[in-house]
Amino acid sequence: MSEQQYIMAIDQGTTSSRAIIFDHDGNKVAISQQEFPQYFPQPGWVEHDPLEIWDSVQSVISNVMIKSQIKPYKIAAIGITNQRETTVIWDRHTGKPIYNAIVWQSKQTSDIAEQLIKDGYKDMIHQKTGLVIDSYFAATKIKWILDHVPGAREKAAKGDLMFGTIDTWLLWNLSGRRVHATDVTNASRTMLFNIHTLDWDQDILDLLDIPQSLLPVVKPSSAIYGYTGDYHFYGVQIPIAGIAGDQQAALFGQAAYDKGSIKNTYGTGAFIVMNTGLKPTLSDNGLLTTIAYGLDGQTHYALEGSIFVAGSAVQWLRDGLKMFDKASESEQMAVDAKTTGGVYVVPAFTGLGAPYWDQEVRGAMFGLTRGTERGHIIRATLEAIAYQTKDVVDTMVKDTQLPLTALTVNGGASRNNFMMQFQADILQTPIKRAAMEETTALGAAFLAGLAVDFWEDQDELRKLSRIGDQFDPQMDPQKAADLYRGWQRAIAAAQFYGKD
């Protein structure tokens, strides 16, 4: 493979779109980023304009090509990674969306999800899709749009409409409106996809009255989906060859290819994903079963746990309690405090995610005394992020019976050395921090590169996915166990208070 060639990754996130060009050594050559508007038509509703998303993607592609000075024919392939679950329905003839994109965290379809639970479909949907019934996933969003947009049901019945998660919407536009497809990771987040048969599930489609003609073709994560349209890249047809949802792309970018490998992406919340190998593991403890990636004719599965509040707890200390001016200051203040002074912070501002799934519980502080200082509360808040991670990781180990050997980490809060050391101590496991921040985009690039033989195999990719720092446990195991017991008491007390 000529060393003159490159891979482009499109990373379409919840608040911004990015295009990144990588070379053959997995180095970042150029990056462009652009934010786009968020819409909140009613409390709890979150929407995007799909045309604004597409405009932002075209803009970052153009900018990154200008920045890098790379000719289009030198781009060997394009990979796409995306905010998952966000739902677009558009007219296949005009290419125009019939409604805004309903974003993953939007609550406007909660009533549909609650009705499905009341009607007794919880076990059936969990068995088939690996997911819990929730408005988070695409299924209820599709039904809502079909039910609420005038004429949508009639158009859908005639086969005039197309559904896609954001990857599908971008692929359709990027391919000159020729390819309507998605990958197995994104399909597995719709609550319509049977993770055992690897096909759309007719029983669930019938239940929600969703015509199959609406749905994209499902392909492996690493495959040539199609080629760029004539009006992009000066007419050079570049293969679009890799697609994965953002958390799965981060797993792939961190080379977590072995069964039992776990990664944690610390963002506003935190997403912990464990590669469980070639067979799905259904969790008895509130974790989601999902698809990690599809590659070389094989489907790899994963368990996922979401923590609602991670980095946003630090923002709360900064913006809500005015404890410091910059989030980065929290690290030194936590170190200077030396201990939490017996304080535990449960940052359940919007309830608790995995493995508790408790919507009623609210944030709380325990162990306050007259001697409690600002530093104690800051340190306890950072420690809470590590405790929540342990809650999920321990559940994964319990569900799979696989040993925990290390946790690879990326995302903003992973740059906090104090927190990463405490994470290693409380898990009693080494923490490996990614050298590159853009591991999600790198994962999409890896998937695309494999499909066009830019890279040979996963062994080559392991060498390119570099670890920056490793944090080994330094705390006495008994002390770590005692601290964690205190956390479990704090959670139980917060849940008790949240009950009517």
Swiss-Prot record:
One of its GO terms (cellular component) is cytosol. Pfam families: FGGY_C, FGGY_N. GO terms for biological process: glycerol catabolic process; glycerol metabolic process; glycerol-3-phosphate metabolic process. Activated by phosphorylation and inhibited by fructose 1,6-bisphosphate (FBP). Its EC number is 2.7.1.30. GO terms for molecular function: ATP binding; glycerol kinase activity. ADP binds at T14, R18, T268, G311, G412, N416. InterPro entries: ATPase_NBD, Carb_kinase_FGGY, Carb_kinase_FGGY_CS, FGGY_C, FGGY_N, Glycerol_kin. The modification Phosphohistidine is found at H232. NCBIfam families: glycerol_kin, PRK00047.1. Homotetramer and homodimer (in equilibrium). This is Glycerol kinase. It comes from Limosilactobacillus reuteri (strain DSM 20016). The lineage of its organism: Bacteria, Bacillati, Bacillota, Bacilli, Lactobacillales.
